[in-house]
A protein has these predicted regions:
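Short acidic/histidine-centered micro-motifs embedded in hydrophobic/aromatic stretches
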Residues: 43, 69, 82-86
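Short basic helix-loop element that most often maps to the first helix and adjoining turn
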Residues: 24-39, 102-105
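Short alpha-helical DNA-recognition segment
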Residues: 34-52
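N-terminal flexible/basic segments that precede or flank functional cores
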Residues: 1-18, 82, 86-121
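Short, basic-rich loop-to-helix N-cap that marks the start of a DNA-contacting helix
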Residues: 58-71
C-alpha cells in the first residue's frame, strides 16, 4: 500500500468535509445521468476504483481527475473562479493594511516640492 503524504494526513476537517461533499455531488450527477461507474470511469480515463475513491471524496485523488469529472457535468469552466483574486478578501485586506503602513507623513516642505509652490498658495 502506498505511503500517505503528510499533507493528506493533516487536512483540516473543513477540507475533508468539502471533498466528501464534492465527491457525493459528483456521484449524484453520474447517477442522475444514468451512467454506470464503469462507463463513467472510462469516459474520465480512470479505473473504477479511482472513480469510487473520487466519489468518496478521497484527497489522494488528483485534482485533474476531479476537474475532469466537473468537465463531464458541464462545470469545468467554474474551476478558475475558485481562486479568482477578486474573491480573495483576506489578501485584499492585507494589501490595504500594507498601503496604509507605507503611507508616510510628509513635511510641508516635501509637499511643496512635490506639488509645486504655486499649488499651495
Amino acid at each position: 500500500m502506498p505511503k500517505t503524504p503528510g499533507a493528506l494526513s493533516t487536512l483540516p476537517p473543513a477540507v475533508v468535509t468539502a471533498l466528501r461533499g464534492l465527491g457525493e455531488n459528483l456521484a449524484i450527477a453520474r447517477v442522475r445521468r444514468k451512467e454506470s461507474q464503469r462507463v463513467w470511469a472510462k469516459r474520465m480515463g480512470v479505473s473504477v476504483p479511482t472513480l469510487i475513491r473520487m466519489e468518496q471524496g478521497d484527497a489522494g485523488v488528483s485534482m485533474g481527475i476531479y476537474a475532469t469529472a466537473l468537465w463531464l457535468i458541464g462545470r469545468g469552466q467554474t474551476l478558475p473562479e475558485l481562486a479568482d483574486p477578486k474573491h480573495d478578501h483576506a489578501a485584499l485586506e492585507l494589501d490595504v493594511r500594507a498601503a496604509v503602513k507605507r503611507r508616510a507623513v510628509r513635511s510641508p516642505a516635501s509637499v511643496e516640492a512635490r506639488l509645486g509652490r504655486k499649488a499651495l498658495k
